[in-house]
From Swiss-Prot:
The gene is rps3ae. The lineage of its organism: Archaea, Methanobacteriati, Methanobacteriota, Methanomada group, Methanococci. GO terms for cellular component: ribonucleoprotein complex; ribosome. This is Small ribosomal subunit protein eS1. InterPro entries: Ribosomal_eS1, Ribosomal_eS1_arc, Ribosomal_eS1_CS. It comes from Methanococcus maripaludis (strain C6 / ATCC BAA-1332). Belongs to the eukaryotic ribosomal protein eS1 family. Keywords: Ribonucleoprotein, Ribosomal protein.
Length: 225
């Protein structure tokens, strides 16, 4: 019995610590987002990094505290050394923030639009308009149609990076607000979600030591309570 136990102990395999063999890679945003490091991820094989999604808040990326509710998503599309490049694949807004914007005696108007930018990128954009007072159905329809047209027109006239900047930093929302408030009193506009459906021309590869470009915020106009 003792011999059997000895053989068993001798033939037992030692578990390998796979974490020790992993290499950490820095994930960079595209140059249009500053080419900054937004996180690190481990991998045994760099090929397994391709397709991984990294999340960062717009506040952390731009140092704009007012953008804390917006989350951006970047997909790894290349690896060089210990650096992983990525491309923007979409954004969303926290549910808590969206709920906090809805008030009684106001109407909520949603629009979901598939658009294509000047350089061939296809995106699905979701926008929200909150009216200052309750709107009738025909007003809601008119505003929704106008929202969709503005989003399509801006996408068609701009390149991908410029359109994404307008979505995230308020330019698109301000355009919708300015045009639609002529039709009905509005309180707020949010471009609360986007998703890249098809990529157009090659996305520029981030470089390790690129200087971050300052991004000026285009505030969404808002009426007073």
């Amino acid at each position: 019995m003792a011999r059997m136990k000895a053989r068993s102990a001798k033939g037992k395999r030692v578990a390998k610590d796979t974490w020790k063999s992993k290499v950490w890679y820095d994930i960079y945003t595209p140059q249009s987002f500053g080419g900054d490091v937004i996180g690190q991820t481990p991998a045994n094989d760099p090929a397994t990094l391709i397709g991984r999604i990294s999340e960062i808040s717009l506040r952390d990326l731009t140092n704009e505290h007012s953008k804390h509710m917006t989350r951006m998503y970047f997909k790894v599309d290349g690896v060089s050394g210990n650096n992983a490049t990525s491309q923007f694949v979409g954004h969303d807004t926290t549910r808590e923030y969206l709920k906090s914007q809805v008030r009684r005696r106001r109407s909520k108007i949603n629009a979901i639009v598939d658009v294509r930018t000047k350089d061939g990128f296809k995106l699905r954009v979701k926008a929200l308009v909150l009216t200052a007072v309750r709107a009738r159905d025909h007003h809601k329809t008119e505003i929704r149609v106008k929202m969709e047209q503005i989003i399509k027109d801006m996408a068609k006239e701009t390149a991908f990076a410029e359109f994404v900047h307008a979505m995230l930093m308020g330019g698109l929302g301000s355009k919708i607000y300015g045009d639609c408030k002529k039709m009905f009193p509005l309180k707020r506009v949010e471009i609360f979600k986007s998703e890249v459906l098809e990529f157009g021309k090659a996305v520029e590869a981030p470089v390790e030591e690129a200087a971050a470009e300052e991004v000026a915020e285009a505030p969404v106009a808002e009426t007073q309570e």
